Amino acid sequence: MKSNLAVFFITCFFCCVFVTSDSVYTLPFPFPRDQVEILLELKNEFPSFNCDLTWKLDYFGRMDTRANISSWTKDSDSFSGVSFDSETGVVKELSLGRQCLTSLKANSSLFRFQHLRYLDLSENHFDSSPIPSGFGRLTYLESLDLSKNGFIGEVPSSISNLSRLTNLDLSYNKLTGGIPNLHSLTLLENIDLSYNKFSGAIPSYLFTMPFLVSLNLRQNHLSDPLENINYSATSKLLILDMAYNLMSHRILEPISKLANLIQIDLSFQKTPYTFNFDFLLFKSLVRLDLSGNSVSVVGTGSENLTHLDLSSCNITEFPMFIKDLQRLWWLDISNNRIKGKVPELLWTLPSMLHVNLSRNSFDSLEGTPKIILNSSISELDLSSNAFKGSFPIIPPYVNIMAASNNYFTGGIPLIFCKRYRLSLLDLSNNNFSGTIPRCLTNVSLGLEALKLSNNSLTGRLPDIEDRLVLLDVGHNQISGKLPRSLVNCTTLKFLNVEGNHINDTFPFWLKALTRLEIIVLRSNRFHGPISSPEVSLSFTALRIIDISRNSFNGSLPQNYFANWSAPLVNTPQGYRWPEYTGDEHSKYETPLWSYPSIHLRIKGRSIELGKIPDTYTSIDFSGNSFEGQIPESIGDLKSLIVLDLSNNSFTGRIPSSLAKLKQLESLDLSQNRISGNIPQELRELTFLGYVNMSHNRLTGQIPQSTQVGGQPKSSFEGNINLCGLPLQESCLRGNGVPSTPHTQEQELPKQEHALNWKAAAIGYGPGVLFGLAIGQAFARYKPVLFYKLFRL
C-alpha cells in the first residue's frame, strides 16, 4: 500500500513538473525544439495575414491549401507547408507560396534553417524591397523559388554560395543590373529569370553549364553575348526562351551549335535585322517561335517540329515548307501580309490540330470538300481576313471556330450543328442574316461560347441549353423576349444582347445564375421597374451591369444595393501584378471566352474593352427614367470603378456614402434633378479621374480637390447655384451660397476687427466708470494715504 502511494505521488510530481513547464512542447515526433522555435519566430515576423482570398486561387479558380503559416502553433501537426527530415528532424522543406507575406527582414529567422533544401516563397508581397543576402547562408538549398514577389534591385552576390542548387526561379520580379553570377552553380538544371529588368550582355557560360536543361530569360533588356561560347558536345540545354529582349540576328549562329535544343523562343526582339533561320542547323527542334521579327526561313524544317509560330513576321507568302512537317500540330502565321487562297496542303498534314490564319488577307479556302473533310484540324481561326460570300466547308472535327471580321453573307450555316463537339463559335462582325439556328443551342452540341454580334440577324433568341459560358448577340435586329431557358445555363458568365429590339421587363430570374459576371442589356426596349418588393436582387458574382438606354422606370429602394455581389462589395486587398498575366503575345493556353469584347461607357466615352480585367467593376443605369433618391446603399459597393446614373430623373441629394467608393474612377450623375450640395467628402476619392454632375439643381461649393475641382467647367454647368472652381462663379456672401475658403480668409480679418472692438468696449467701459468714481472721491475727500503714496 505504501509503495503504491509512493508511486502515485512520484507520478503526480513529475506530471506537475512537465505540465507547468512552458518550455516543453507536446510533439508526436522527436523534432528538435529549436526547429519549432525558429518556425514560430518566423511566423511572428509576419504579423498580418489578411489578404484577398482570390490571391490564394490557382489558375483554375481552386483554393490553394498547400500551406497556412497563420495556423502554426506549438503543435507540430499544425506546420502545413513544412517538411521535416525523417532521420534528423530538421526542417528540410518550406512551401510558403501565396501566403500574403510581407517585409522579409535581412536578419529573418528563415536564414537559420541551415539544412533547408527546398524553399518556395513565390507569390507573396515582398514588393519594393531587395532580395536579402541571407539566402546565401542556406548552403544546402537545392531549389529556390522567389518568383512573383516584386523584389527590386540587384541579386545579391551571396547567391553564388548555393553550390547545391539545381532549380532557381526569380521570375516576375523587378530585378535590375546584369544577370547574377551563377558560374559556380554547376549543378543547376533550371534557371528562370524571366519578366525582370536585367540588362547587359548574356554571360556565355549560361549556354554551356553541364547540367542545365532549361534557360528562361524572357522579357528583360538583354543583348547578345559578348564573349565567344565554348561549346560542349555534352551540353544538355533543351529549352531556351529569350523572347522580348534586345537580341540581334547574330544570336542564331551561337545557339545553332547547341545540338540538343528542342525548344527555342526568340520572339519580339527589338532589332531591325532579318532573322535568317536555317532549319538544317536545328535538326532536333520540336517548338520554334520567331514571332514579332522579320524572318527568312531556309530549309525544309525539322522532322520533329510540332509547334511553329511565325506570327507578326511581315511575311507575304504562305510557308510552303510545312508540307514536309508530318508531326506539326500547332501553326500560327497570324498578323502577316499573306493574300489569296489558303493552300490545300494545310488540310493534308496528318497531325495538324491548331491553325491561326487571322489578320491576313486570305479570301478563300483551296481544296475539294473530300480533302477538307479528311482534315484533323480542331481549332481554326480565320478572323480578320477578306473572306466573303457564303461560309465555306470546314474540317469535321473543328471545336473552336473563329471567323469574325470578314465579309461572310447569307444565313448561319447548319454545318455547325453537325459538329461532334463545338466549344466556341465566333462569327461576329460579318454580314450574316436570318435567324439563329435552333440547333446551335442544343445541349448535345456542347457549345460554350457563342459570339454573333454585329451582324444582321433577326427573329427571336432560341431557347438556350445548359453548358453555355458566353453569349454575345449584340448589335443585331433580334426581337421578342429573353428566353427564360437562360436560367438553366448555370455556367453562364457573360451575357450581351445590346443594340437589339428586345421588348421585355427586367430579368430578375437571372439572379439564379451564380456565376454570371457580366450583363449588358443596353439599347433595347426593356421597360418597367428594376426593383420588386417580392424579389430581392442579389447577384453572387456580378461585376459589370449595363442596362442603359432602355425604358426602365420607378424608384430604387434605399437598400437596393445592400445584397449585391461580392466582387462589387468586397474591397480589393493585397497587391496584384499586371505583368503576371504575361506579355501581350503570351503563348499560354487560355480559353478564348475568357476575353469577351464589349463596349462600355467610361469617362463619358464609349470604349471597347477587348480583354476585360478580372477586377473591373461597372454599373451603368444611364438613359432610363429612374426617379426618386439615389440609394444610400450605393456606398456598399466598395470595389466599384465606374458608376453612370446620368440621363434619368433622380431627385434628392447626392448620397454622402459615395465617399466610401475608394476605388471609383468615373462618376456620372449628369442630366438628372438632383439638388442640394455636393458632399465635400468626395474629395477623399483619390482615384476619381472623371466627374460629371452637369444639368442638375445642385447648389453650394464644389469640393476643392484635384479629383473634383480639377474637372473641366462643363462637368458642373447647368446647375442652379454652384460656385467655386472650375466654374467662374466665386462663393461670395450674398449669393445665397457658402463662402469659398479664399473669401473666408478675406473676411476673417474684418470679423476679428469687429470682435476686437467689442472686447475693447467691454474692457474699457467698467474701467472708465471706476476711474471716474475714484477721481470724484479724491477730489472731495483727499485721503491721506493716497497723498503720501503719490505725493499729491
Swiss-Prot record:
Q: Which residues lie on this side of the membrane: Cytoplasmic?
A: 780-792
**UniProt-listed Gene3D superfamilies:** Ribonuclease Inhibitor
Give the signal peptide range. 1-21
Indicate the transmembrane segments per the record.
759-779
Q: Keyword Methyltransferase on this protein?
A: no
Residue numbers on the Extracellular membrane side: 22-758
Q: What is its main location?
A: membrane
* UniProt xrefs under PANTHER family: LEUCINE-RICH REPEAT RECEPTOR PROTEIN KINASE EMS1-LIKE-RELATED, RECEPTOR LIKE PROTEIN 30-LIKE
- Its protein name is Receptor-like protein 54
Protein's gene: RLP54
